[in-house]
Each structure stands twice: as C-alpha cells, then as structure tokens.
Amino acid sequence: MSGSYAPIEDSADELSVHSGNDNEIDLEKGLLPKCNTGNGGTTPCSEPPHYDSDAVVEMDMYENNIYMRTFKLRPFAKSGVTNSSNVVFQMKTYENNRHMQTFRLRPFAKNGVTNGVKLAQSLFLLLPFNFIFFACLFFRKASFTDFSLMGWILFGIWCLTCFLSSFILYAYHESWTKFARERSQEFSLILFGLLFPGIVTMVVFYALYMRSMYG
C-alpha cells in the first residue's frame, strides 16, 4: 500500500482547508454564503457576507460646523420592516452658538436694545388700563386689606389677563407689528376685542369695591 504524504510546512496551513472546488474556508469566519447559479445549483459567493444588526445608531459629528451636528437614531435595521427604516429621530444641537438656541426667552441679550423695545411695546399696550385702575384705587385711598373674596378673585383674573396678553404680544411681536402697520383699523378692533374681558373685569372689580366701601 503506497501513498503520498505532504507534511505541514507552516502553521498557517492549519488555518485553511482546500475543498474540491479550490475555495478556501476560513475556520474563524465560517463557510462562505451560497449564491444561486441559475440552474438550481449553488456556489460560494466571492463577496464577503453582510451582517445587519437589529439596531443601528448613527452619530454624525461635524466638529468644524456646529450647524450640521446631527444625531440619528434608527431603532430598526434595513433588513427589518421596510417602513421602520424611515423612523429617524434627529436632534440638532447648537452648543457653541448662543444665537441659535432653540428654546430660549432672553428679553435682554446681546441685542438687548431690540428685545427691550419689543418688551416695552408689549407692556405699553397694557399700561394705560393698569394706570387707570390703580389711579382710581389710590384716589379713593383703597387698601388691599379691604378686598373681599370676590375682589381678590377678580384681581387675580385681571393680573392673569395682563400677563398672558403681554407674553403673547412679546412672543408674536413681528407678526402683530407687521399686521398693525398694514391694517391699522383691523388691528385696533382685534386688540380691543382681546382686552375687552380685562376691561370688563376692571370695571366690575372697581364697582364692587366702591359698593363695599360706600354702600
């Protein structure tokens, strides 16, 4: 009985085994994926296998451009449900640029003159009504200790109305000032309609107070 035996020359030969079709099999990565040949057979693919994870988290950092810093979170892989790959939550942060903060309320910032004018214009629309109201109270030598329960309730409604009106006027300053320049008559009617509940509250509050003081 005769046969040929080729001794192993190098330890690297132990990591590869030649099959009948002369394709190497990597013992660490496993078998190559099978590809269809068209006639019903399969042959090992030449391309390496692709592995899709269940969750892909992509974070694109643009250090030189803080406006383009985007964090993308994809909870599903492309191999899963097709529509689920479109679920992308993007959160843009602008850390080094104070002017581009999304949520901010800065009445007095670097452009404090502009924001100060906006705040002054918003409050100026309510000052005449408050001035008349408190002037009447001080003229009659009114005191907050003389207020009844209904008086305090009406006073709270009046303060809440003034606060909400000032906040809305400040938040939408560009919109209502542009509308006031273009359509001044309509703006006057709308402004009066918005402040009418506060005016009525002021009159009723003052009437109840005068009635409690002088019968």
Swiss-Prot record:
- What cellular component GO annotations does this protein have? cytoplasm; membrane
Q: Where is this region: Disordered?
A: 1-21
- Which InterPro entries does the UniProt entry name for this protein? WTF
Question: Topology in the membrane?
Answer: Multi-pass membrane protein
* GO biological process, any: meiotic drive
Coarsely, its chief localization is: membrane
The entry's localization annotation reads: Spore membrane
**Which Pfam families does this entry report, sorted A to Z?**
WTF
- The regions listed as transmembrane in this protein's record are 119-139, 149-169, 189-209
Q: What happens when the gene is disrupted?
A: Normal vegetative cell population growth. Simultaneous knockout of wtf15, wtf14 and wtf11 results in normal spore viability.
- UniProt keyword list: Membrane, Transmembrane, Transmembrane helix
> What's the miscellaneous note?
Although the gene is capable of encoding two isoforms, RNA sequencing data show no evidence of alternative transcripts.
Give the record's family classification.
Belongs to the WTF family.
Q: What does this protein do?
A: May act in meiotic drive.
Protein name in the entry:
Wtf element wtf7
